[in-house]
């Protein structure tokens, strides 16, 4: 009987997650499910770093899921990701294969590893009013009486604690069947890249994608009728390149501000992954600089290692 139902490969931007996932998928004859919140969009290729050529290993196309599934302008969210992930996961498992979930969007990855379905929770003004005068200590005690959906590290302010209670209260009144989400036992691999090397690779990739036509990609999206507000909403490359195309930033301003923003984004990704470890997930970190064959071999050894 298989020890794991899934392999998850995570890491910050420019760490080499996708080539590793593809090399592993080739070795295991399996398929990749993308866990990236922006690669779901069609025609947003250079700006989201799709690098589709990475999915070809030794001349073989590695099947992938959840890339290019919605049109630009749409506001895709984590609730839809859970649904779409399960559909893709079931398709791969149906073939008796071990799927590989690969991405850097921590919220998306954690949403399927946690084991409960996320629901969009509306505000409850009446409940908020009833909690408004309580201290953080009182709210934390109250929160502890619910089925534990939240970790205490997430509720370090009164506002967060009230929202956590609001979510717990909403879930309490949903049927168990509605909340059901399969328990997926995943081997989680983290690609660990030294900060300076990460920064160097981010800067190199940014220059490379600009050379490959990222500005023209943004112009084409705007020309096709996608609003500048929608592109700015997607953040990072699309935000700063749109501001550049609109004449609100010079090229140098755009490049400098975008470079800083991507470095900050990578740092936030690592913060999320370290938070996952505090929340009880075991992440097996591999040095990004190891030869690909060594990384793949280490993962396969972990797959077969007994607890």
UniProtKB/Swiss-Prot annotation:
Binding, ATP: 11-18
Alphabetized Pfam families for the sequence: IPPT (PF01715)
Region feature (Interaction with substrate tRNA): 36-39
Superkingdom: Bacteria
Required cofactor names: Mg(2+)
Alphabetized GO MF terms: ATP binding; tRNA dimethylallyltransferase activity
GO BP terms in the entry: tRNA modification
HAMAP family given in the database record: IPP_trans
Family membership noted in the UniProt record: Belongs to the IPP transferase family.
Name under which the protein is recorded: tRNA dimethylallyltransferase 2
Organism for this UniProt entry: Phocaeicola vulgatus (strain ATCC 8482 / DSM 1447 / JCM 5826 / CCUG 4940 / NBRC 14291 / NCTC 11154) (Bacteroides vulgatus)
Source species taxonomy: Bacteria, Pseudomonadati, Bacteroidota, Bacteroidia, Bacteroidales
